[in-house]
């Protein structure tokens, strides 16, 4: 007599993750190593190499060969109106010369709202969620994304092409989730055929994903929010169990709003989760009276403060635990000296 087992969605996701990790088909790790730390900043700032010592990009590139991924973002992913843009060609080449392992080109996807088979109601929902007009949604079809990717490959021959796909959240409309993930896997395969298997494809849902969406990317930016939420014990599913079978270099966390009081805890949390790529900044995000495209407070319009960069260097170099003890000792000495002088 046949027996049947009731399998939950969570159980299915866990099994998908186990099998996918076991039969990993990627032949290379794109220059990254499991367990290593990579500083992968969100470099949405315009190329400004001509500003010399005041260049924002120069601050990022000071990290040299500890840089993992940097992002070239021309007007929120507009690669078709000016071909090529010499400023971006120059800045990308400078990033490679500085030691960045991968330079990626930013392209919006608007959460797949214009992908094949998506209903009009989903497009409307995305426009509402992003607080933008529908005209800011409709251009972003799968074919438009492929055309944009093809353009950067042709126009920037001195920069090996890698693609950063923004706005890829699969949780916005649960009734369409499987269809959305299927569309992103299809897009991933199309990009690989168009650009080659050496092209690193990053997706940015800004949150965790079902295990099945790991087939739609090489690296997933699976957390993009503030430090307080990152450290809150009540925040669940930052790095769910179904991610555990994948190497650390496939995950990227972006944490804004860090403070001197919590930044070391942020690094410790990332290490406990096994996150390879990290960007931490003290700058803050607030939509306010703006939109997702043009927020009132933008954490990516400037590099982090110098004190953040110093802590990042300690995290990369593996000296952060020692520096934490040293800082605590210095604070204790100051406290004792203050008492002695009373």
Question: How would you describe each model-predicted region?
Answer:
Residues 321-324, 328, 335:
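Alpha-helical coiled-coil heptad-register detector
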Residues 8-321:
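Glycan-processing catalytic domains of CAZymes
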Residues 331-342:
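Helical coiled-coil/dimerization "stalks"
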Residues 1-2:
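Sec-dependent, cleavable N-terminal signal peptides
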């Amino acid at each position: 007599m046949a027996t049947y087992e009731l399998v939950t969605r969570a159980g299915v996701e866990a099994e998908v993750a186990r099998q996918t990790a076991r039969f990993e088909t990627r032949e290379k790790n794109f220059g990254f190593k499991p367990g290593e730390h990579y500083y992968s900043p969100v470099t949405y700032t315009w190329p400004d190499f001509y500003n010399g010592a005041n260049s924002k990009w120069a601050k990022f590139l000071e990290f040299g060969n500890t840089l993992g991924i940097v992002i070239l973002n021309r007007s929120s992913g507009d690669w078709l109106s000016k071909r090529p843009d010499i400023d971006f060609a120059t800045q990308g080449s400078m990033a490679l010369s500085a030691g960045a392992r991968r330079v990626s080109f930013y392209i919006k996807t608007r959460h797949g709202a214009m992908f094949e088979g998506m209903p009009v109601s989903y497009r409307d929902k995305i426009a509402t969620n992003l607080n933008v007009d529908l005209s800011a949604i409709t251009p972003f079809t799968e074919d438009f994304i492929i055309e944009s990717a093809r353009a950067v490959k042709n126009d920037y021959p001195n920069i090996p092409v890698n693609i950063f796909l923004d706005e890829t959240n699969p949780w916005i409309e649960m009734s369409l989730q499987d269809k959305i993930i299927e569309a992103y896997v299809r897009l991933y395969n199309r990009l690989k055929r168009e650009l080659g298997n050496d092209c690193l494809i990053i997706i940015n849902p800004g949150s965790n994903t079902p295990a099945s969406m790991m087939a739609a990317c090489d690296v997933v930016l699976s957390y993009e929010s503030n430090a307080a939420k990152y450290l809150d014990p009540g925040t669940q599913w930052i790095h769910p169990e179904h991610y555990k079978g994948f190497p650390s270099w496939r995950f990227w966390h972006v944490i804004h709003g860090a403070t001197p009081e919590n930044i070391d805890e942020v690094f410790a949390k990332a290490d406990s989760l096994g996150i390879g790529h990290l960007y931490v900044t003290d700058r803050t995000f607030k939509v306010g009276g703006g939109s997702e495209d043009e927020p009132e407070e933008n954490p990516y319009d400037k590099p982090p403060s110098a004190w953040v960069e110093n802590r990042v260097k300690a995290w990369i170099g593996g000296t952060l635990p020692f520096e934490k003890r040293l800082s605590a000792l210095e604070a204790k000495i100051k406290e004792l000296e203050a008492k002695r002088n009373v």
